[in-house]
């Protein structure tokens, strides 16, 4: 008999959680998705109803998994407890990582592939630099983070301000750069700067709030195992990469991107279309890779982004205006999927700093 559960939340995080639980626990059946706010919620997710958290219409003996942003977990847990629920599991960052990794182990195994992670590999010596993007608009961290010796802070959008961040040893407005595009391209102005100006043989990109969780000897392991690329552990989104973007952003930007790809290379465009019907991508425009791989990626990626941005222009709201960065997450994931037989790719978890 199936174990019936509730998931609190009905949007992207909750749907991702549902995919993990259903894949890992085939005996689990989702009774409903719950909510208690005034946001616009779907009536159903797939065939599962989305219902308001109210007294009298729920099975309080069922377990509840909270699939929302962590800042809401305490408030939601209190609301659930007040209605009589006892089996409440907030899906925090640590549990999300465990579920995501277990899901990907199973996903890769079912396709006859190994899910390789950097911390499982052996070691040997090498040097490299991971550039950490930071801007004058970034909110302060609640707790101080000490950068690793291999991390270099790069101030992004430096061409748009006279203010300099004292902890940043590099700015993205020197040499060949696109620093003035930072309001649209976000951390991609750092990526472009790294491509055109950085001198390391192995380079990476992270954010001031998001860093890779790496073993101390990750550089050595990368060399001895001939790893070409380290990407963030993939994230599952529903209903597909394509529809997830089109629902959360302007669908016309997506449509123009696909039309541009088709006009440039019809075969590649079809491969991209097929990939974007799937659900897994490496988020946040983060990576560590060998220089020659970076050169190939950026030479392929930036012409696409420049074409879309040139066509779609700027948006009035700051979040929507960042569409080139959201497109690039999907494009980078597609690039490495279509080249997975050429490059030795492994994955690493990442953190999120409050």
Region spans (language model):
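A residue-level structural signature of the nucleotidyltransferase/glycosyltransferase Rossmann-like core
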Residues: 5-9, 65, 210, 285-286
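A short, acidic, amphipathic alpha-helical segment used as a generic capping/interface helix at domain edges
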Residues: 16, 49-56, 328-335
